[in-house]
């Protein structure tokens, strides 16, 4: 196969992932309000796609227009391909919302009322709502030499209003801009009695269209057109110019709201001259204009399920499994000393990790606590426990990653609070994101210091621990806990990388470990020994790993990869990758665990890791991979993380050589296997 065709386009692969998510919104087996949620997830993902990936392609095209990307194409060619795919996906989204979901919701008594269908009583209520809730806070900006075109915030809802007449100062007016503050709901619920006892909603844009004239008394409104600008949201900090990273991040967060435009969304009813006017204001081309059949922001529909009390239209609740040995008065440290603990979230509760930190904060025998924070949410019992530990006089060290994309402001806030509580807060290593998920507790026992560590594949975030699938290992293994301590010393101090006993770390040893393990399986296959690689991750795009997998496949290694999102490897190509199979599982839970298993002549070397197989994870982040050696725990990781995923025939998508996906289905006479439901049955409470 030609060199340029061996690697697929990562952006197209990411859009293909979102197409699989959108299939959940189409699936009649998914509860109706959950289908609406999946539609919103796709919109949110697309926002980030334009803010990050499309913005990167635009920058690359400007700086290196002739440089070929990993997929063998130049940036301009890739932009054209990606734009076409994005348009197709967005059209599909709106068709689904307008022609499928809205009618199905209406049959369930959940209505989105268009202006032309408002009853007189609804019109009266909506006008009162506008007068009471919107009119006092909206600020129209007329465009003239003293009122230049305003700079809209990233992804904010705005309206271009065409006017006729003269204002109070005798000025002729042609156009004004009205910005809708983010604090306003984009979907407004109507009183039940106005909806025949059901649930009714109107879009904020519809309310503004109907009553925008009240913002311009005495003027004639000729037209009102919603628009939304997506901006480049890359956050860059120059290492040489920064004295205080936290302060620099805070400054950059403000500037990010006003990055270069990458996408302009308007309703399909917007006239051509308004579209052209807006494109000129934002220095965008027609290729960057997206006309949609409906509201320009479907993300905000995610408020609807919480406003509708219809359990029959939502997923049934699950009960998480709990660590039975952790009784009311039991010590988690005593449990860990007996044997390492493996947790599989969300099927098993995240509470033992929280309990470990709570107990550490209150236990007089605990001398020090260390933890990394990448994403932790706006409310965190873990961070509260760290603050309590610091206030109790313990040595608390927290590595807060301030560059966690779109969580920067939240992490800055936690960093301030932790410092005020007396914790030592470190902002990682400049130029390398600290993505490793690790915690360490140091306790005095019988006159000797004993370490306890937690290593995970997911964030210390209690909210996402109920949604994302992840593994966590809690252990008192002396070599692993010593390694975790060494990693914290590397991050917080200065010096050369320490020698690790069992863990592998990026950016130093993890990539080499993966390449070496693949090479070993390749040699085993060449020698006629059984050879197999099974791995699960979020993304696989690193070219040297892909080429190593191709070599392994050519040698006869059987390779099964479970990759939820981006995968730029081509599976199933004769002579290149015929022994590689790739599947993606999309379901109620977000598959997030990273698990690698190398057969190694029957030893089944198994790791859980914070790292995907991407260049950034191997070379530009601090990551960990921990071996799972306890026989029972290894069996669990292989079965729950890999084998059951490979058996799924209800939510699995099978990747094709061209980068497309086909949904798996049970063969004739085969029973259904549903990874996530089966794990709830196996591990749930």
UniProtKB/Swiss-Prot annotation:
The active site is at 435 (phosphohistidine intermediate). Keywords: ATP-binding, Kinase, Magnesium, Metal-binding, Nucleotide-binding, Phosphoprotein, Transferase. Pfam families: PP_kinase, PP_kinase_C, PP_kinase_C_1, PP_kinase_N. Mg(2+) binds at residues 375, 405. It catalyses: [phosphate](n) + ATP = [phosphate](n+1) + ADP. GO terms for cellular component: polyphosphate kinase complex. One of its GO terms (biological process) is polyphosphate biosynthetic process. InterPro entries: PP_kinase (IPR003414), PP_kinase_C_1 (IPR041108), PP_kinase_middle (IPR024953), PP_kinase_middle_dom_sf (IPR036830), PPK_C_dom2 (IPR025200), PPK_N_dom (IPR025198), PPK_N_dom_sf (IPR036832). An intermediate of this reaction is the autophosphorylated ppk in which a phosphate is covalently linked to a histidine residue through a N-P bond. It is an enzyme of class 2 (transferase). Its EC number is 2.7.4.1. GO terms for molecular function: ATP binding; metal ion binding; polyphosphate kinase activity. Its cofactor is Mg(2+). ATP binds at residues 45, 468, 564, 592. Catalyzes the reversible transfer of the terminal phosphate of ATP to form a long-chain polyphosphate (polyP). Belongs to the polyphosphate kinase 1 (PPK1) family. This is Polyphosphate kinase. The lineage of its organism: Bacteria, Pseudomonadati, Pseudomonadota, Betaproteobacteria, Neisseriales. The gene is ppk.
């Amino acid at each position: 196969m030609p060199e340029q065709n061996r690697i697929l386009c990562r952006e197209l692969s990411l859009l293909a992932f979102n197409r699989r998510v959108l299939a959940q919104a189409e699936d009649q087996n998914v509860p109706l309000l959950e289908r609406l949620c999946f539609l919103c997830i796709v919109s949110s993902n697309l926002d980030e796609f334009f803010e990050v990936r499309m913005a990167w392609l635009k920058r690359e095209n400007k700086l290196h227009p002739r440089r070929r990307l990993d997929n063998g194409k130049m940036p301009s060619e890739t932009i054209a391909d990606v734009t076409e795919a994005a348009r197709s996906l967005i059209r599909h989204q709106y068709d689904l919302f307008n022609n499928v979901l809205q009618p199905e919701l209406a049959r369930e008594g959940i209505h989105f009322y268009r202006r032309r269908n408002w009853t007189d009583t609804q019109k009266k209520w909506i006008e009162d709502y506008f007068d009471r809730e919107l009119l006092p806070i909206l600020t129209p900006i007329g465009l003239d030499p003293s009122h230049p075109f305003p700079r809209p915030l990233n992804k904010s809802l705005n309206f271009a209003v065409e006017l006729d007449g003269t204002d109070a100062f005798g000025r002729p007016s042609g156009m004004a801009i009205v910005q809708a503050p983010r604090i306003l709901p984009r979907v407004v619920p109507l009183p039940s009695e106005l909806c025949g006892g059901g649930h009714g909603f109107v879009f904020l844009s519809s309310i503004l269209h109907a009553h925008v004239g009240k913002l311009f008394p005495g003027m004639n409104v000729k037209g009102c057109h919603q628009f939304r600008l997506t901006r480049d949201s890359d956050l860059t900090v120059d290492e040489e110019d920064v004295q205080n990273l936290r302060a620099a991040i805070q400054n950059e967060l403000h500037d990010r709201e006003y990055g270069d435009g990458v996408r302009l969304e308007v309703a399909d009813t917007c006239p051509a001259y308004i579209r052209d006017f807006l494109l000129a204001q934002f220095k965008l081309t027609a290729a960057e204009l997206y006309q949609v059949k409906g509201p320009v922001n479907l993300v905000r529909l995610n408020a609807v399920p919480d406003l509708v009390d219809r359990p029959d239209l939502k997923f049934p609740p699950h009960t998480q499994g709990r660590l039975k040995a952790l009784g009311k008065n039991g010590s988690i440290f005593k449990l860990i000393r007996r044997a390492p603990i493996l947790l599989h979230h969300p099927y098993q509760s995240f509470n033992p990790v929280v309990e470990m930190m709570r107990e550490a904060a209150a236990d007089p025998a605990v001398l020090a606590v260390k933890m990394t924070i990448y994403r932790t949410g706006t409310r965190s019992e873990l961070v509260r426990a760290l603050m309590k530990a610091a206030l109790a006089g313990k040595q608390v060290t927290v590595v807060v990653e301030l560059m966690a994309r779109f969580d920067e402001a939240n992490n800055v806030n936690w960093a301030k609070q932790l410092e005020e509580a007396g914790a030592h807060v470190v902002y990682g290593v400049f130029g390398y994101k600290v993505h490793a998920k690790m915690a360490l507790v140091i306790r005095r026992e019988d006159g000797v210091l004993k370490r306890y560590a937690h290593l995970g594949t997911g964030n210390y975030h209690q909210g996402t621990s109920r949604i994302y699938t992840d593994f966590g290992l809690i252990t008192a293994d002396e070599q692993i806990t010593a390694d975790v301590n060494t990693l914290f010393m590397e991050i917080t101090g200065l010096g050369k990388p320490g020698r690790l006993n069992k863990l592998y770390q990026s950016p130093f040893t993890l990539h080499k470990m993966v390449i070496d393990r693949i090479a070993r399986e390749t040699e085993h296959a060449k020698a006629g020994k059984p050879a197999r690689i099974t791995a699960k991750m979020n993304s696989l795009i690193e070219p040297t790993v892909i080429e190593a997998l191709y070599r392994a496949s050519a040698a006869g290694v059987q390779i099964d990869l479970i990759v939820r999102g981006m995968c730029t490897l081509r599976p199933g190509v004769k002579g290149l990758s015929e022994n590689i199979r790739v599947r993606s599982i999309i379901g109620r839970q977000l598959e997030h665990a990273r698990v690698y298993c190398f057969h190694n002549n029957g030893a089944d070397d198994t790791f859980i890791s914070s790292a995907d197989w991407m260049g950034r994870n191997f070379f530009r982040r601090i990551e960990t991979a921990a071996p799972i050696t306890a026989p029972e725990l290894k069996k669990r990781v292989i079965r729950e993380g890999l084998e059951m995923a490979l058996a799924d025939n209800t939510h699995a998508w099978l990747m094709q050589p061209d980068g497309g996906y086909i949904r798996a289905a049970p063969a004739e006479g085969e029973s259904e296997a549903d990874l996530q439901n089966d794990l709830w049955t196996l591990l749930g409470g």
